[in-house]
A protein has these predicted regions:
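A conserved short coil-to-beta-strand element within the FAD-binding core of flavoproteins
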Residues: 192-206, 312-324, 335-337
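Ferredoxin-type iron-sulfur electron-transfer modules and their immediate structural context
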Residues: 1-125, 173, 212-230, 320-326, ...
Length: 403
């Protein structure tokens, strides 16, 4: 019985991995590839190839090689989390080579690199819903294949989370604009501030185009689910970073800011609040600092800039004053417990009184959701969390030409 339960637990915890093995006969977590760093790269970029080209001083060729698998070499040179370095063979000697740094050096030295020529026109048309990394990547390679591509996005500008989720201090907007313009130069048509279901229906897209690729991203916020979350001064990370992406900078001058969360988005909000004039910024996280999902360099950067990391404290409630404005965030101290499925100690409530954290602004940065409900009425099925169900990772079941 115990053995059977272990198998069941594994099937539940690693459902996607088992499904990938059964359906596609491959292992996404396999580290036995001939080139481990390439195996860890989500885009499968030829890392040894472009590193060798950088070594030879062929910077433009290095950029061209990266583009074979990833049309955003500049973006990744600035903001990639570089998982490839975890599997760099140099770790067996002393430490990984600075792969992302070499990519950054290549794109800086290469300057403007001409895009490859598109294949002969096929006469096929494709609509891409969403102008973020996924949508623009699909548009790029479809255009190279000779298809006519049109991108629709609900925001003022293209870029998705690269623009509306990552602050400009990490990725300068002029660099993002240049890279997007380079992609569009392949003849890709783009329409911004177009919302599907309002300005144009999904059915109209299906009728107008030979294929539709849905790449809507995760642009809705998630609630903490605590008392007082509707107080004035409580903002979501999605809202705050989205406003910053549009150039609408909030004024935190002299204010006390509390950020809830421990991921990269929480660090982006924390460090942005410091830059926006906050008098004091506290990042409240229910686990230990070493359990944060944010990159260590981002956490260390936030601390170096004067932010406080209040760990092992779970948000309990938000206190509002008589006018309904945020006055404080209450947090319950935690102690570490058993290891969870992700390999991190599970936080448990400590037998001590809650802590009151004075605050004028509370930023909720605990993840994003997917606004896929607009597509469900048109036959796109979703699973928990709003993720669209697809076959072979892309094709939408029972809808021809929809991916």
């Amino acid at each position: 019985i115990d053995a059977g339960q272990l198998v069941l637990n594994a099937l539940i915890a690693f459902h996607d991995d088992f499904e990938e093995h059964v359906k596609n006969h491959r292992c996404l977590g396999c580290m036995e590839d001939a080139i481990p760093c390439v195996a860890k790269c989500p885009a499968g970029v030829d890392i040894p190839g472009y590193v060798a080209l950088v070594n030879e001083g062929h910077y433009a060729d290095a950029v061209k090689l990266i583009r074979k698998d990833n049309p955003f070499p500049v973006s990744c040179a600035y903001i990639c989390e570089h998982p490839c370095e975890q599997r760099c063979r140099r770790n067996m000697v002393d430490g990984a080579i600075n792969i992302r740094g070499l990519k950054r050096f290549a794109v800086d030295q290469a300057g403007d690199v001409e895009q490859p020529a598109c294949a002969e026109a096929t006469g096929k048309t494709v609509a891409v819903v969403g102008g973020g990394p996924s949508g623009l990547t699909a548009a790029y390679y479809l255009a190279l294949m000779g298809h006519k591509v049109t991108v629709y996005d609900m925001h003022k500008k293209l870029g998705g989370m690269m623009r509306y989720g990552i602050p400009s201090y990490r990725y300068p907007r002029e660099k993002l604009d240049e890279e997007i313009a380079s992609i569009l130069s392949l003849g890709i048509e783009a329409h911004t501030e177009v919302k599907i279901g309002v300005d144009i229906t999904f059915q109209e897209l299906k009728q107008k185009f030979d294929a539709v690729y849905v790449a809507i991203g995760a642009h809705t916020d998630k609630k903490v689910g605590i008392e007082g979350e509707d107080a004035k001064g409580v903002v979501s990370a999605v809202e705050m970073l989205g406003n910053i992406g549009d150039g609408n900078m909030p004024d935190f001058t002299g204010k006390r800011v509390a950020v809830i969360g421990g991921g990269n988005v929480a660090m982006d909000c924390t460090r942005s609040a410091v830059r926006l004039g906050a008098e004091f910024v506290t990042c409240v996280y229910r686990r230990r600092q070493e359990d944060m999902t944010a990159q260590a360099e981002e956490v260390e950067g936030a601390i170096a800039e004067g932010a406080e990391m209040l760990t092992l404290h779970a948000p309990l409630k938000i206190e509002a004053d008589e006018n309904g404005n945020v006055a404080a965030l209450w947090a319950q101290p935690q102690i570490i417990g058993e290891i969870d499925k992700a390999g991190r100690p599970r936080p448990n409530t400590a037998s001590v009184d809650p802590l009151r954290i004075p605050a004028d602004v509370v930023i909720v940065a605990i993840g994003q959701g997917i606004e896929s409900n607009l597509f469900e009425a048109d036959g796109l099925k979703t699973k928990r969390g709003g993720t669209i169900i697809a076959e072979d990772s892309t094709k939408v079941p029972s809808l021809d030409g929809v991916f």
